[in-house]
Swiss-Prot record:
<dbReference type="GO" id="GO:0003735">
    <property type="term" value="F:structural constituent of ribosome"/>
</dbReference>
<dbReference type="InterPro" id="IPR035987">
    <property type="entry name" value="Ribosomal_uS8_sf"/>
</dbReference>
<comment type="subunit">
    <text>Part of the 30S ribosomal subunit. Contacts proteins S5 and S12.</text>
</comment>
<dbReference type="InterPro" id="IPR000630">
    <property type="entry name" value="Ribosomal_uS8"/>
</dbReference>
<dbReference type="GO" id="GO:0019843">
    <property type="term" value="F:rRNA binding"/>
</dbReference>
<keyword id="KW-0694">RNA-binding</keyword>
<dbReference type="GO" id="GO:1990904">
    <property type="term" value="C:ribonucleoprotein complex"/>
</dbReference>
<dbReference type="GO" id="GO:0006412">
    <property type="term" value="P:translation"/>
</dbReference>
<keyword id="KW-0687">Ribonucleoprotein</keyword>
<dbReference type="InterPro" id="IPR047863">
    <property type="entry name" value="Ribosomal_uS8_CS"/>
</dbReference>
<dbReference type="GO" id="GO:0005840">
    <property type="term" value="C:ribosome"/>
</dbReference>
<comment type="function">
    <text>One of the primary rRNA binding proteins, it binds directly to 16S rRNA central domain where it helps coordinate assembly of the platform of the 30S subunit.</text>
</comment>
<keyword id="KW-0699">rRNA-binding</keyword>
<keyword id="KW-0689">Ribosomal protein</keyword>
<dbReference type="Pfam" id="PF00410">
    <property type="entry name" value="Ribosomal_S8"/>
</dbReference>
<protein>
    <recommendedName>
        <fullName>Small ribosomal subunit protein uS8</fullName>
    </recommendedName>
</protein>
<comment type="similarity">
    <text>Belongs to the universal ribosomal protein uS8 family.</text>
</comment>
Length: 133
């Protein structure tokens, strides 16, 4: 049993990008699917597909990873911020700027999962799920 499925998903993505895998499979949930779709919209992942593998009882999210022209990693750093043991909530004014605006902080708000720029624009704070650049 996993105590933090979001951290597991981020670790799988981190490990797959470091070994230059084309795809990575993670156990599916609605929250993870929203997070994966946000990564696609921000340009860090090429695609996401919800599927069921042969003989598996549960759905799986298959993320197609993205690399640069010379196979350099698009995701250079990915880190879980708010954990089950220590939640991290911030107001709209205190949303972190990641790598001087070149990175993304993923924030869970009352309007759904949003990148930090969008949350700042809408004036909503929330729980900082992870940061990446």
């Amino acid at each position: 049993m996993l105590s933090d499925p979001i951290a597991d998903m981020l670790t799988r993505i981190r490990n797959a990008t470091r070994t230059h895998k084309e795809t990575v499979d993670v156990p599916a949930s609605n929250f993870k699917e929203q997070l994966a779709n946000l990564l696609v919209a921000e340009g860090y992942v090429a695609g996401v597909e919800r599927t069921r593998l042969d003989g598996q009882p549960a759905d799986v999210l298959r993320l197609t990873l993205k690399y640069g022209a010379k196979r350099e990693q698009v995701i250079k750093h990915i880190e879980r911020i708010s954990r089950p043991g220590r939640r991290a909530y911030v107001s709209a004014e205190n949303l972190p700027r990641i790598q001087r605006g070149m990175g993304v902080a993923v924030v869970s708000t009352s309007k759904g999962l949003l990148p930090d720029r969008e949350a700042r624009k809408l004036g909503v704070g929330g729980e900082v799920i992870c940061v990446l650049w």
